[in-house]
Amino acid sequence: MDSSGGFQKHTCGHALLLLLLLLAGGAEAFRICAFNAQRLTLAKVAREYVMDTLVRILARCDITVLQEVVDSTGSAIPLLLRELNRFDGSGPYSSLSSPLLGRGAYKEKYAYIYRSHRTQVLNFYLYPDEDDLFAREPFVGQFSLPSKVLPSLVLVPLHTTPKAVEPELKALYEVFLDVSQRWQSEDVILLGDFNADCASLTKKRLDELVLRTQAGFHWAVADGVDTTVRASTHCTYDRIVLHGERLQSLLRNAGAFDFPQSFGLTEEEALNISDHYPVEVELSRAVHRIQPLSLATLLLSLLLLLLSPQLGLAA
């Protein structure tokens, strides 16, 4: 009897289990984020430590909606995308940006940054704000999901102006109705810097909004979650609201990402990035297909299989 046989079988089992885990990367969550990047310009992203931090934030998400992109050159997002695609192999990433939006000289754009091997843009449009209800009308996007449960969803980003939070959030319900009818989709995420707290909107007025009273809407980033960087403030300005039974059934987690704490930044350092935390939702069971493996992982797996007999890993 080979006294090492048990060891060989045990080791072989671990090796095969490791390989199966590598191949079964499809069980991971799908993360959707919204981030007010605070006056994002070409000069800002050209600062190395700002770029490095932004890339680390974006690399956590499958889709990020950036707000307050005020770059008039059109070069900031491509530069950010280039560095993101060089970062850690989690890409490739692509982007989709709105035109510059605003009533006066000050204008912003929305920008979607997304992992193009996990999701694709199916449709998009700028909400036709004929009555000028929004300072920055939503730039609506429909995205595919690698899911049999939920093959696509719609994102409706909004950065409200602090002087008109309540009327803009009332009008956001009309945008929801418009997109639901246009694309026959009930699975919709409303997200962004709503300024829906503190001095901008009282709790009483917030709770009177149709988006709060109408059945079917789930405010995933709950009241009381601090989405601001400054220690002197505690406001839930940034929100993510989910509509649709299938979409809500996939919700695994939601909240704000405290990037200063995660990355070891002081408040002063963090404020050079933004005065807002990103907010995010994670959808479980969203991904069902095998994720692409890196070349190094494939080579390591093949080497392990080829060397198993020599290493005594075979039973």
Swiss-Prot record:
Gene Ontology, cellular component aspect: endoplasmic reticulum; nucleus
Tagged with keyword Transport: no
Family matches, as SUPFAM superfamilies: DNase I-like
Catalytic residues as annotated in Swiss-Prot or TrEMBL: E108, H159
One biological process term in Gene Ontology: DNA catabolic process
Entry's EC annotation: 3.1.21.-
Entry keywords, A to Z: Disulfide bond, Endonuclease, Endoplasmic reticulum, Glycoprotein, Hydrolase, Nuclease, Signal
Glycosylated residues in this chain: N272
Stored Pfam families: Exo_endo_phos
GO molecular function: deoxyribonuclease I activity; DNA binding
Leader peptide range in chain numbering: 1-29
Cysteines joined through disulfide linkages: C198-C235
Localization terms from the record: Endoplasmic reticulum
InterPro entries, sorted: DNase_I, DNASE_I_2, Endo/exonu/phosph_ase_sf, Endo/exonuclease/phosphatase
Tagged with keyword Transmembrane: no
Family: Belongs to the DNase I family.
Record-linked PANTHER family: DEOXYRIBONUCLEASE, DEOXYRIBONUCLEASE-1-LIKE 1
Protein name: Deoxyribonuclease-1-like 1
Protein source organism: Sus scrofa (Pig)
